[in-house]
């Protein structure tokens, strides 16, 4: 009835004569599914369904950011560092915070993937007049020059990722703990 219909009831799955349907099998086409993120990414581990968390920049890169963020157990890991943008993953332990900070020339975007927290922001270090609770899937936009802090108020690690424009940390940054992050920001003494 229809050209190249592969279903045993040819009228069940009609296919037009001009379609390239040589790959159809019971209504499934490989063109509808993109599995290249697994096969094409040599750092993807099929057996554990994990990704190697390291800095992939500045090369083109695609990642399941939710999976990578939830997988991360370090205080901070740079996932991608480019010329004008950086993506870092963070895991904030219960009762800890990212630390009160200010990036004079860097806008920042933070997305909470898992956990509960409190974000505080303000124009001065001693005057944080913006306060908002955050949960899973909340996004925080921090303008350059704004003092800010994110505090984990939940009973599990607060998993988030942060986007800096321009980059804030050196390529390949990995801070296992908040203490190591603070020590590296202070520099050698």
Specify the residue positions occupied by each region the protein language model found.
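Glycine- and acidic-residue-biased ligand/ion/polar-headgroup-sensing regions
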Residues: 105-124
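A short, N-terminal "cap"/entry segment at the start of jelly-roll beta-barrel domains
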Residues: 1-84, 132, 178-189
């Amino acid at each position: 009835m229809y050209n190249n219909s592969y279903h045993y009831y040819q009228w069940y799955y009609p296919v037009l004569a001009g379609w390239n349907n040589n790959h159809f099998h019971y209504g499934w086409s490989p063109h509808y599914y993109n599995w290249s993120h697994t096969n094409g990414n040599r750092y993807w581990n099929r057996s554990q369904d994990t990704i190697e968390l390291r800095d992939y920049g500045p090369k083109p890169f695609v990642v399941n950011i939710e999976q990578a963020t939830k997988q991360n157990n370090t205080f901070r890991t740079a996932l991608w560092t480019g010329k004008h943008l950086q993506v870092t993953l963070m895991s904030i332990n219960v009762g800890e915070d990212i630390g009160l900070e200010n990036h004079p020339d860097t806008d920042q975007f933070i997305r909470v993937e898992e956990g509960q927290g409190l974000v505080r922001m303000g124009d001065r270090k001693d005057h944080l007049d913006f306060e908002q609770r955050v949960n899973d899937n909340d996004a925080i936009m921090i303008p350059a020059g704004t003092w800010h802090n994110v505090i984990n108020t939940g009973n599990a690690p607060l998993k988030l990722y942060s986007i800096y424009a321009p980059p804030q940390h050196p390529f390949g940054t990995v801070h296992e703990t908040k203490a190591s992050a603070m020590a590296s920001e202070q520099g050698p003494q």
